[in-house]
Amino acid sequence: MENAGVAIELALSEVAAGVFELRLPIPFEDGLVNVFVFPDRHEADLLDCGMNSDESVEAINRALAHLGAKRVRRLVVTHIHPDHYGAAGTFAGEGRADLYIHRLEVPLVHPRYVELEHLVEEVRHYLLVNGVPAEDADVLSNSQRALSQVVKTADPSVQLDGAELIDMGARRLRVEWTPGHSPGHICLYDVADGLLFAGDHVLPELSPNIGLHPQSTPDPLHEYLEGLRRMAGRRPKLVLPAHGRPFPDIASRVDALVSHHRRRLDQILEIIGREEKSGWQVALDLWGPRDNLYEKRLALQEGLAHLQALAVEGRVSKSVTPGSVRWASA
């Protein structure tokens, strides 16, 4: 038990007064997700909760005990991807913590994690019409079933719109709606101390996946870029992301992310040239061959989001038939 205590101390760190970052493992990936614990006497509030794996749930419970919290009072989820929402049903609902989620995330939960068959078929059709070979489309559409195994759902107590104030521990945080990575993605902003809890919206090293797919909004890239500019305009003193370490300079990071996506738009326009292409062709040309099918799916989603942004800007045209979607220079 002493060794377990040492391990939790290594994974748990106070990143601001009364704010503790807990780094949790992500099953299936060689990575970590940061969740944030806000202790308040014998209770605590949580921002995100990791996947519903034994290792993650045990780590959260040990962190709560280490901080003297006997129960979770509020669980706020930045978005319903499994590494952020997975353990929601373990810590919230049915007399446990109150669960807060943006209202645009709520209708995505049931088809993604509970009754999967319709979404699996919808994703398969989406992959096929965008040029994915049938064998790959079958594998990729069925991969959703594996993710559902690390998610325990819960009904929200509060559906958020943005601009609400939520007390987390001793802090009062404002909800910032930042769609793009997910339709109802939110950040939490501590106006008093200039702390931005950024979820997956602004990461210090990685560019979050901005994808066009059956559960996305119609134009996720433009929404994402607008949200980046809004968060930079808040001028936070410290950004606390869901992946990677806290960092102080949001302005230069946002500039880098915006420039990255603008370069990618130009690259895709060059790839299309004068030849009509599928989203799958564009993704393979842009990112090259990859053995990992899941990475290929993310590449397709990201490529399609950029193609859609180019279409909105009037720089490409989109041709849709019952069996295919093709893109060409406008």
Which residue stretches match the model-derived regions?
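C-terminal regulatory/interaction regions
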Residues: 1-3, 266-330
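Short aromatic-enriched loop/helix-cap "lid" or pocket-rim segments at secondary-structure transitions
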Residues: 32-34, 111-114, 209-210, 252-253
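Residue-level detector of beta-strand structural context in well-folded domains
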Residues: 10-11, 34-36, 158, 163-164, ...
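Metallo-beta-lactamase
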Residues: 44-53, 142-158, 165, 172-265
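Conserved beta-strand hairpin/beta-sheet module of binuclear metal-dependent hydrolase folds
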Residues: 9-67, 71, 97, 188-199, ...
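Short, contiguous alpha-helical
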Residues: 93, 178, 311
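Active-site HxH/HxHxD metal-binding segment of metal-dependent hydrolases
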Residues: 52-56, 61-167
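Histidine-centered divalent metal-coordination motifs
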Residues: 78-84, 102, 181, 185, ...
